[in-house]
């Protein structure tokens, strides 16, 4: 029978429940247990697809086209297991399903209430993950903070869940904060005590406490928490801040989190194999070189808006024994300032996805700068569309070339709406979403990186390259290195004679993993490292020449 671990959070939001859930999944997998992780989000949106990146951060897209919380990206990267739409549940989707059932008459005229109808639907979603993927263990992260009114139906549902499936098949894990108070010179447990008290008032007694802290727990603190929260000392787990999130599974393993949880579930503890993971972390912590890459985006004020891009760059950095320092550049700043002012000195430029006209001209200027100065460039989704616009304006000399998304009156809409999107009215869940095949063109840089003819990548867009301009682009030197299998949709472009200039309509960042960096990100980081060396050698040579000139004595001829 499938076992279930529920992860709740207390005291503050953004406590790190997602990383704890993902880390626990990694620890279970290292013991050869199959795992699936489910996120229950208490917001009323049906999914995060229409939410502002400034509020929610990145929208992570699964193979089956679900627009989900960024935590699902952590789940996939840590467990190396693909998630699906079943792994993301929101209050909005729960209420939508219940109301649809009521409209169909499924409740036979009964009064529809939070208990039992909403809670039953929540429990059904949890069971659905277990039935469809049949894992040994399902980890369920409950979004929000204990005490929030929005979380109450989910907490009531998981309270009922243990009674229905059996005490030995469920573990309640509570992630909480142990703050350090400088004035007192000590750590305080009172916030955690109150958080556990709040959980108990709902009918949930946590089995495991995961204590987030910025320094080691002081002597006696675990015993104190054990006494006041009625949790065994061995189940009070320290989770100290780490230099990288990939260190967290190793820290939690040292604290015995997986072993304690497996014992509570009556499962064999087994010996973990974390050798590969330890090697990855060691490589991250001992790089031999550093490069600086500019990320030119619309939402750079919140780095979580580009979380998977940042992680994919990090994965490639591990493989190249380097560290990637990101220079966050607002695309809007490039509309008013010179590109050189913001981009000088970088070894690579990434232009990621986005929606809407704001900042587009800044992205175009960044791409022009990369092309002119032979700086490695990687464009993603809108980044590819902007590279098409840049080429159309500056090389193909198409007057007022633009995307139909940004200028419906453009005489040269080199990016146009997909035909199947013409009659779409709703915004949520209606784009070209999920995994699609892409056929690569032989003898291209892209083909050399992937080393295969057909690849599968995740998409999230409504607009595509306008094929009315394909011949003109090819005539002016553009290379189309990837298309849909029928050749209709342009999916990848590149420029010959450039160290690295590749742009994709899809989002390769969603399929990158710490142990298997995505080929395009790996190629980009390698090219950026090479560019950095060439640039540094050039600067050294210039310095030598200047010094030589300054030290050359002047000779008077007469």
Swiss-Prot record:
Pfam families linked to this entry: CTP_synth_N (PF06418), GATase (PF00117)
Annotated residues for binding of CTP: 13, 148-150, 188-193, 224
Activity control summary: Allosterically activated by GTP, when glutamine is the substrate; GTP has no effect on the reaction when ammonia is the substrate. The allosteric effector GTP functions by stabilizing the protein conformation that binds the tetrahedral intermediate(s) formed during glutamine hydrolysis. Inhibited by the product CTP, via allosteric rather than competitive inhibition.
EC number: 6.3.4.2
Residues where UTP binds: 13, 188-193, 224
Cystine crosslinks: none
Binding-site residues for ATP, renumbered to this chain: 14-19, 71
Residues that coordinate or bind L-glutamine: 354, 382-385, 405, 462
Binding locations of Mg(2+): 71, 141
Pathway: Pyrimidine metabolism; CTP biosynthesis via de novo pathway; CTP from UDP: step 2/2
An annotated GO BP: pyrimidine nucleobase biosynthetic process
Additional remark text: CTPSs have evolved a hybrid strategy for distinguishing between UTP and CTP. The overlapping regions of the product feedback inhibitory and substrate sites recognize a common feature in both compounds, the triphosphate moiety. To differentiate isosteric substrate and product pyrimidine rings, an additional pocket far from the expected kinase/ligase catalytic site, specifically recognizes the cytosine and ribose portions of the product inhibitor.
Role played: Catalyzes the ATP-dependent amination of UTP to CTP with either L-glutamine or ammonia as the source of nitrogen. Regulates intracellular CTP levels through interactions with the four ribonucleotide triphosphates.
PANTHER family the record matches: CTP SYNTHASE (PTHR11550), CTP SYNTHASE-RELATED (PTHR11550:SF0)
Name of this chain's protein: CTP synthase
Organism of this sequence: Gloeothece citriformis (strain PCC 7424) (Cyanothece sp. (strain PCC 7424))
Source taxonomy: Bacteria, Bacillati, Cyanobacteriota, Cyanophyceae, Oscillatoriophycideae
């Amino acid at each position: 029978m499938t076992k279930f671990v529920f992860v709740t959070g207390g005291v503050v939001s953004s406590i790190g429940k997602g990383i704890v859930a993902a880390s626990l999944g990694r620890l279970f997998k290292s013991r050869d247990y199959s795992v699936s992780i489910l996120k229950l989000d208490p917001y009323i949106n049906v999914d995060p697809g229409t939410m502002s990146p400034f509020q929610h951060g990145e929208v992570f897209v699964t193979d089956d086209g679900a627009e989900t919380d960024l935590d699902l990206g952590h789940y996939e990267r840590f467990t190396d297991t693909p998630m699906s739409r079943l792994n993301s549940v929101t209050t909005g989707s729960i209420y939508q399903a219940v109301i649809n059932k009521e409209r169909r008459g499924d409740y036979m005229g009964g009064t529809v209430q939070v208990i039992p109808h909403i809670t039953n639907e929540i429990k059904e979603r949890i069971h659905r993950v277990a039935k469809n993927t049949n894992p040994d263990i399902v980890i369920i992260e409950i979004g929000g903070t204990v005490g929030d009114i929005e979380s109450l139906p989910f907490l009531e549902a998981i309270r009922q869940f243990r009674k229905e499936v059996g005490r030995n098949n469920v573990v309640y894990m509570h992630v909480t904060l142990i703050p350090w108070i400088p004035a007192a010179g000590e750590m305080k447990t009172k916030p955690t005590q109150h958080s556990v008290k709040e959980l108990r008032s709902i009918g949930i007694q946590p089995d495991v406490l995961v204590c987030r802290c910025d320094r080691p727990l002081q002597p006696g603190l675990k015993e104190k928490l054990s006494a006041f929260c009625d949790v065994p000392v061995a189940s009070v787990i320290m989770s100290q801040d780490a230099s990288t999130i990939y260190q967290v599974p190793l820290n939690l393993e040292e604290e015995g989190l997986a072993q304690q949880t497996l014992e509570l579930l009556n499962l064999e503890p087994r010996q973990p194999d974390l050798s590969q993971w330890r090697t990855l972390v060691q490589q991250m912590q001992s790089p031999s070189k550093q490069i600086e890459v500019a990320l030119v985006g619309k939402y750079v004020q919140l780095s979580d808006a580009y979380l998977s891009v940042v992680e994919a760059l990090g994965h490639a950095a591990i493989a190249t024994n380097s560290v990637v320092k990101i220079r966050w550049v607002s695309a809007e700043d490039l509309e008013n300032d010179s590109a050189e002012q913001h981009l000088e000195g970088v070894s690579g430029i990434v232009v990621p996805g986005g929606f809407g006209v704001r900042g587009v001209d800044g992205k175009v200027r960044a791409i022009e700068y990369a092309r002119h100065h032979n700086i490695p460039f990687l464009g993603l989704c809108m980044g590819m569309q902007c590279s098409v616009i840049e080429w159309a304006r500056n090389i193909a000399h198409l007057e007022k070339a633009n995307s139909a998304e940004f200028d419906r009156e453009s005489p040269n809409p080199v990016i146009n709406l997909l035909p199947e999107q013409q009659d779409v009215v709703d915004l949520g869940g209606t784009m070209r979403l999920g995994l699609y095949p892409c056929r690569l063109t032989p003898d291209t840089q892209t083909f050399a990186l992937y080393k295969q003819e057909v690849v599968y990548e995740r998409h999230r867009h409504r607009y595509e390259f306008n094929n009315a301009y394909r011949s003109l682009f090819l005539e002016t030197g553009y290379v189309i290195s990837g298309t849909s299998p029928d050749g209709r949709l342009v999916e990848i472009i590149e420029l010959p004679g450039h160290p690295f200039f590749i742009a994709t309509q899809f989002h390769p960042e969603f399929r990158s993993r710490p142990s298997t960096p995505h080929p395009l990100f790996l190629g980009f980081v390698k090219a950026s490292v090479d560019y950095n060396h060439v640039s540094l050698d050039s600067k050294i040579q210039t310095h030598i020449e200047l010094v030589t000139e300054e030290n050359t004595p002047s000779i008077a001829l007469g």
